[in-house]
């Protein structure tokens, strides 16, 4: 199974409610560039943070790559969520290609946890970065990092 991690594109500056920040034009361009790397992937499930910028990223990416399935908005993919709790939630997703659209520091910590069982040294993920993890199942130290790509915008 492959777990694909996509950080949202560049967003408007911090506001009173972080969850309401939206993608900027640069952020949309970043997502479109990331989509070029993912056009050949057929995602079985797409999960997104409920934050606006992540939902916009998931919508734009899925439209760009022709993904016709639903985007599942889950409350446990926010920047503050705990890696072990997210790992437990993901345990039930036995699919070939799973895409998570979320935030730092969660995605970097999740990648480190799944590949090294270490949360202290999170994987660096700029806006619209894409990481691919692969393993037989989701668990601490049970996956391998197959790729990490950063946009150049």
Question: Which residue ranges define each predicted feature?
Answer:
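Active-site-proximal alpha-helix that buttresses catalytic centers in soluble enzyme cores
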Residues: 2-84, 107, 121, 125-128
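Generic beta-sheet signal
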Residues: 3, 95-102
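MPN/JAMM (Mov34/JAB) isopeptidase/deubiquitinase module and associated MPN-bearing subunits/adaptors
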Residues: 34-37, 146-151
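Glycine-rich phosphate-binding loop signature in dinucleotide/nucleotide-binding domains
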Residues: 40-42, 92-96
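Alpha-helical structural signal in soluble globular domains
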Residues: 60-65, 89, 113, 117
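Extended, charge-rich low-complexity interaction segments
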Residues: 104-113
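Domain-level recognition of soluble alpha/beta enzyme cores
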Residues: 115-144, 150
